[in-house]
Amino acid sequence: MEAARVGAQSRHLYGGGLGEPDMDRRDKRLFGWDLNDWRWDSDRFVATPVPAAEASGLALNSSPSSSEEAGAASVRNVNARGDSDKRKRVVVIDDDDVEDDELVENGGGSLSLRIGGDAVAHGAGVGGGADEEDRNGKKIRVQGGSPSGPACQVEGCTADLTGVRDYHRRHKVCEMHAKATTAVVGNTVQRFCQQCSRFHPLQEFDEGKRSCRRRLAGHNRRRRKTRPEVAVGGSAFTEDKISSYLLLGLLGVCANLNADNAEHLRGQELISGLLRNLGAVAKSLDPKELCKLLEACQSMQDGSNAGTSETANALVNTAVAEAAGPSNSKMPFVNGDQCGLASSSVVPVQSKSPTVATPDPPACKFKDFDLNDTYGGMEGFEDGYEGSPTPAFKTTDSPNCPSWMHQDSTQSPPQTSGNSDSTSAQSLSSSNGDAQCRTDKIVFKLFEKVPSDLPPVLRSQILGWLSSSPTDIESYIRPGCIILTVYLRLVESAWKELSDNMSSYLDKLLNSSTGNFWASGLVFVMVRHQIAFMHNGQLMLDRPLANSAHHYCKILCVRPIAAPFSTKVNFRVEGLNLVSDSSRLICSFEGSCIFQEDTDNIVDDVEHDDIEYLNFCCPLPSSRGRGFVEVEDGGFSNGFFPFIIAEQDICSEVCELESIFESSSHEQADDDNARNQALEFLNELGWLLHRANIISKQDKVPLASFNIWRFRNLGIFAMEREWCAVTKLLLDFLFTGLVDIGSQSPEEVVLSENLLHAAVRMKSAQMVRFLLGYKPNESLKRTAETFLFRPDAQGPSKFTPLHIAAATDDAEDVLDALTNDPGLVGINTWRNARDGAGFTPEDYARQRGNDAYLNMVEKKINKHLGKGHVVLGVPSSIHPVITDGVKPGEVSLEIGMTVPPPAPSCNACSRQALMYPNSTARTFLYRPAMLTVMGIAVICVCVGLLLHTCPKVYAAPTFRWELLERGPM
C-alpha cells in the first residue's frame, strides 16, 4: 500500500501504523494497489489475485529506476499478526512548492499519493528510521538521508542531495552548481545545461546562455515555424473557449483529489471558485452538474483559503476580460502554479473556432500535467526567468505554452496507425477482399478503482460499444488508479467513427452496462487524438487534441525492432519530444508491463537536432510474441511502436526494416508508404504470434479466424525481401491451423500460391534452396509425405520453375539450385518436362542461347545419371577351398554398362542401313572436315599435273612425283 500524509502529521498505512489488518474499501482505492498482487489475462480482460506464496517470489513487473532516487520499492509488512507476505510500496516525493526547511516538521514528512505512478513517502513513520528490503534485494530508507545518499557530481562538492528537490537528486547536481557558470566535473571545466540537464564543456555554450548551443538551435528553430493564422469567432466562441479551459483546469485538480495534502486544500478551494464563476462564463454548462466532481473531495479536511478564492476569481475575471478583448488578445490558459494542481499544465484542447496569433509574452517554463502523477518533480521556472512573474494565462504563441494548441483548429486530426502520420499508405490487409484495417489503442483511466472492481464481462462490454467487432484484441493494466490499455485491429472507418462520435459511444457504453462500474467515479478515455472525461455517468468533456504541433511526443523508431526471447536487450528509442518532466517510457508484452521508467533517467546524448534518444535495458520473456514501447507524455500521448520477440534467425531478418524507419526519421521523407507498410507488417506478424500463443496455452478464448488474405500479404512481404526464416514460420503456422483456409488443405493452399515460381522470377537462389528443402514437421497435422515444392511443379500455362530459369538470363545460381533438389527431380525432368506448347527447359535454353545452362546441366546428368555402374556380389558364406574357375560361392566383381533403350527411327532409314552395311565408311566421308581436306588435295594434284613441271621446294630436296612412296599414313 502507499504511505500518505494528512496535514503535517505523517503515518504509514502498513504495519503498526494502521492498527487493524483489514483496511476498508475506500482506503484500498485511495492508496493504490500492487501490480504483483494480480495476474492479468490480456485476452479475457480478467484480473485474478496471485496467491501469497507465489507473489512473494515474484519480481516487480516494472523495473525500478536506474537512478539512486528510484521512484518505487516494494517492502514487506512484518506486523504482529505475522502477515509477512503482504507487500507495500514506499517512495519519495518532493514538493517544490514548499521550502526545504518545511519538508520535515515536528517529526513528520510530506507524504502524498502519486496517481498512476509510484507512490512516494518522505518523512517519518513507523519504522521510518530503519532500512527496508524490497523484492529485488535493494535497500531504501523511508525517512531522512543517509551518508551514502546521492551527492553532487561536481568535484569537491559535499552537498547532500537527500533533502533537496527531485530534479537535483535525479541529475546529481546541487542547486548552486546547477546555476553556476563553471564547475569542475571529470577534471574538466564544464557548465550545467538547463535544457539537457547535464554538464557540457564551456565551448558548447554561447556567452551568457544557460543552455548549450545545440539545444538552443533546435528550440529557436521550432519557435520560428509558422503558426496558423486564425481569427476570433464571436461571443459564443468566447464562452465555449473559456468553458473548455476552465473545465480542463478542473480536470487537473480532480487528477490529484486522492492526496491528503495541505497544498491540495487550496486546489479544493480553487475548484469551488471556478465552479462559482463557470456558470457566468459558459451558459451551456450547468455548474450544478459540475459540482458532482467535488464528491471525491469530501474526505479532505474542511478549510478556507481566502487567497486561493481570490486567485480563482482573478483567473476567471482575467479569462473573461482577455477573451472578450480585441482580436489580438491572449488565449486564456490556467497556470498550474497558481491553481495548485498536480502539475502546472492543463490539457490543451483543440477549439472549434480559430484563434489569433499574438506576440510572445515573457517566457516561463511550462510544467506538463500528468493524470498519473501528483507532481512532475521539475523546477517551476527556468533560471533565466526567475524574476518573471507567474502569469495566470499564457498565449498560444508562447514558446513555453503547450504547442498542441498551435495546430489549426479547423483541421481534423489525421487518423494514423501506430506512430505513422501518413494516411495515404495502403495497409497490408487492405487488398484482395479484406477491408483496410489499422492497429491502434484505446486508453481507459479508471480513478478510484482497484482490479477487484473490474467486472468479469469487461471484455464483452468493451466489444459491445464498438461499432464493429475487432479482428484482434489484447490489453494490459498497470497501477495509478487502473490504466487499462486495449490494442485493437479495427476497420479504418470504425476508428474514425469512434473518434468522431465519442460522446454517443460513451453514452452507449453507459446505457448497455448492467452494473455501476462505468457510471461511478472518474473515467478518462482516449481514442487516438480524442479525449473524453466522465464523472458518475455524466460526460463532462469530449474534445480533440491537436497532435501535429512541435511538442507532441512521437516515437520514430525502436531498435532493435526484433529481439530473441529469453535474452536481455538494450533498446534504443528515437523520437520527437520524448523527454519532459512528466513523460514516462513503458514497455509491455502480452498483457504485462515489463519495464517503465521516467524518460529523464534514460535519455541519451542528442545526436540530431530534433531527434531525442532513450536507452533502456529490459529482460525479455521466454516466448514468442509482439510487444509495445510507449512514451506517455503527461497522460495525453497515444503513440506506440511494436517490436517482435522470436528466434534469432527471424529477428535478424525482421531487423532489416530498421533502415526504413531510420531513413524516414532522419530525412523526413514525404512519402511514408514504406514506413507504414513496415509498421503494418510488424503489427500483423504480432497478431499472428499472439494468436499462436493463445492456441499453445489451449485457452478457450473466442478468436476470429485469421483471414487468408492477411496471411497471404504477410507471405508476399517476406518473399519480396527473401526472408527464409520468416517464410518458414508462416508456413509452419499454416500447417498448425492458425489460418482460416476453408475446405482446402494446407498443401493445396501453399502450392496454389506458386511460391517456387515467384522465387525463380526474383532470381533468389537462397529462397529456391529453402523452398526445395522445406518439409512440414511430421509431428504437425496434415503433413505431406514428400517435399512440398518440386522443380517440375506446373504453374500457369504448365510452366515449371525449370522453364522459367532456362528462359531467364543470368540465372545460373537459380538453375543450379533447381537441379540440386533433394529428390534429383530437376535433372531428371530437364529434358522431359514440357509446357503447354510442348517445349522442354532444354529447348528454352537452346533457343535463348544459354550454352552455360546446357553445359552445367549436362555435367550434372553425366555425374548423377551416368551409364557406368559397379555391381559387387557378396556371398552368404565364405568357402576356404580355392579351385580353378568361378564357383557360385565366390566373390565376383562385374563392371557392366547400362543399355539405353533404342531410339525410335523411321522404316526408310532402317532399310537403307541394311542395303549398305558399311555405314561407317560411308558416313565418314560426309564429315565436313574430311571434305575440306580432300578438296584441297584434289586442287593441288590438278595444278601440279597441269604445270608439268617439278615444284621447287627450297626448304627440302626437290620434290618429284615418281619418288612419292605409297603406303598407309
UniProtKB/Swiss-Prot annotation:
Extent of Low complexity compositional bias: 55-74, 420-431
Zinc finger (SBP-type) boundaries: 149-226
UniProt feature, compositional bias: Polar residues: 393-419
Locus of motif Bipartite nuclear localization signal: 209-225
Subcellular localization(s) per the UniProt record: Nucleus
Domain of life (superkingdom): Eukaryota
GO molecular function, one term: zinc ion binding
UniProt: Zn(2+) 2 binding residues: C193, C196, H200, C212
Positions of the UniProt region annotated as Disordered: 1-25, 54-81, 377-434
GO cellular component, one term: nucleus
Residues noted as binding Zn(2+) 1 in the record, renumbered to the chain: C152, C157, C174, H177
Record-linked InterPro entries: Ankyrin_rpt-contain_sf, SBP-like, SBP_dom, SBP_sf
Disulfide bonds: none
Tissue-level expression: Ubiquitous.
Keyword field contains Transcription regulation: yes
Subcellular location, principal: nucleus
Keywords: DNA-binding, Metal-binding, Nucleus, Transcription, Transcription regulation, Zinc, Zinc-finger
UniProt note: domains: The SBP-type zinc finger is required for the binding to DNA.
Job description of the protein: Trans-acting factor that binds specifically to the consensus nucleotide sequence 5'-TNCGTACAA-3'.
Protein's UniProt name: Squamosa promoter-binding-like protein 6
Organism in which the protein naturally occurs: Oryza sativa subsp. japonica
Gene for this chain: SPL6
